[in-house]
Amino acid sequence: MSTAISPLAPTDVPDLPEIAGVRLATAAAGIRYKGRTDVLLALLDEGTTVAGVFTRSRCPSAPVEWCRARLKDGHHAKAGLALVVNSGNANAFTGKTGRQATKLTAGIAAKAAGCKASDIYLASTGVIGEPLDATKFNGVLETLASEAAPDRWMDAARAIMTTDTFPKVATARVKLGKAAVTINGIAKGAGMIAPDMATMLSFIFTDAPITATALQSLLKSGVEDTFNAVTIDSDTSTSDTLLAFATGAAGARGAPRISRAGDPRLKAFVKAFHGVLADLAEQVARDGEGARKLVEVIVEGATSKASARKIAKSIANSPLVKTAIAGEDANWGRVVMAVGKAGEPADRDKLSIYFNGIRVAKSGARDPSYDEAEVSKAMKNDRIQIKTTLGLGKGRDRVLTCDLTKEYVAINGDYRS
């Protein structure tokens, strides 16, 4: 966790309301950091349903494997459940020791929460390859269970931070049937961000009565154009985890129970749910390690949406493009390079490129009306849009990233120090 807040941090941070059936507590367990909280315990009432999406890394962390096993058949807790998140140690690439640590953590948490170990969800973030000493949770989780309260959202968001410079929270309130329901979300992530099914860590909570199957469908569809459309450094983490919990408490106020993601009564909820995911995903991009500029990459006129996504990712992940943005240089030649290397259909002589709405290249060459002074002024903004039109079809997609600065190198060069 950095002491200097990113200049791209949101200026308007919402107060997250309480959600019936959710209680939170945090503590400093000394996992890696000193003088700050590094453990989150979330307690969820009986009847809570759960859904999750995770990294596609072939080297997943032990907590990811643990959660996947819990969700195999769609989880519905009969006696309540709990979520334990620690920062500072990813418990990844830790072999048998790591798997034993997850079992020990789940056992300690189950005793504290009064449920079964199979009703415990785990997530870890931090250094890869170092064993996690789960005995540090002894006593800590019991205390947290007794202290858990429904209004600790900001504390929860802070406890899961690593190199993040600000806590990431989002909320929405919407009608489901005749009842108002709430959606709250927290996230962390600033580096090793190129999610594939999730982000580094993100947790969504709602009081809507939704079955695990329907919630899983909502989550899978929601991440595609939110968390999966964000990249900081092209590195997909071993620990990417996005979990959603629905307590169903709004059912007592008249909210209908939803068992199908396509239920028309869910339309407003789906929009709000995706909005929370999009808000959190953008905050992750804004907090990219060392970032000074938020970058939106748009690709239009591709042969398909999938092709546009791949080209947009090629541009967004290019160190040459990202350093040019950091240097406030509208270097469209580097964008051309990134389009060309993407391995997708592209016609050089149909290519046009825009920086913040100013066309700098047209039909495969520099725009005849190019004005260096106008473009240079636009590049000083802290939000940069790069739009590329291919002229081949109707495929369009959008990816968020940030610039690449000297600070990124410094942060990651000193990460284990």
Swiss-Prot record:
Site (Cleavage): 198-199
Annotated Gene Ontology cellular component terms: cytoplasm
Subunit relationships: Heterotetramer of two alpha and two beta chains.
Listed name of the protein: Arginine biosynthesis bifunctional protein ArgJ
Source species of the chain: Nitrobacter winogradskyi (strain ATCC 25391 / DSM 10237 / CIP 104748 / NCIMB 11846 / Nb-255)
Subcellular locations according to the entry: Cytoplasm
NCBIfam families membership: ArgJ, PRK05388.1
EC number, as in UniProt: 2.3.1.35, 2.3.1.1
Signal peptide coordinates: none
Site feature Involved in the stabilization of negative charge on the oxyanion by the formation of the oxyanion hole, where: 125-126
Reaction(s) catalysed by this chain's protein: N(2)-acetyl-L-ornithine + L-glutamate = N-acetyl-L-glutamate + L-ornithine; L-glutamate + acetyl-CoA = N-acetyl-L-glutamate + CoA + H(+)
Top-rank taxon, per record: Bacteria
Stored Pfam families: ArgJ
Protein keywords: Acyltransferase, Amino-acid biosynthesis, Arginine biosynthesis, Autocatalytic cleavage, Cytoplasm, Multifunctional enzyme, Transferase
Family membership: Belongs to the ArgJ family.
Pathway it works in: Amino-acid biosynthesis; L-arginine biosynthesis; L-ornithine and N-acetyl-L-glutamate from L-glutamate and N(2)-acetyl-L-ornithine (cyclic): step 1/1; Amino-acid biosynthesis; L-arginine biosynthesis; N(2)-acetyl-L-ornithine from L-glutamate: step 1/4
UniProt cross-references to InterPro entries, sorted A to Z: Arg_biosynth_ArgJ, ArgJ-like_dom_sf, ArgJ_beta_C
High-level lineage: Bacteria, Pseudomonadati, Pseudomonadota, Alphaproteobacteria, Hyphomicrobiales
GO biological process, one term: ornithine biosynthetic process
Binding site for substrate: 162, 188, 199, 289, 412, 417
GO molecular function: glutamate N-acetyltransferase activity; L-glutamate N-acetyltransferase activity
Function of the protein: Catalyzes two activities which are involved in the cyclic version of arginine biosynthesis: the synthesis of N-acetylglutamate from glutamate and acetyl-CoA as the acetyl donor, and of ornithine by transacetylation between N(2)-acetylornithine and glutamate.
Catalytic residues (UniProt): 199
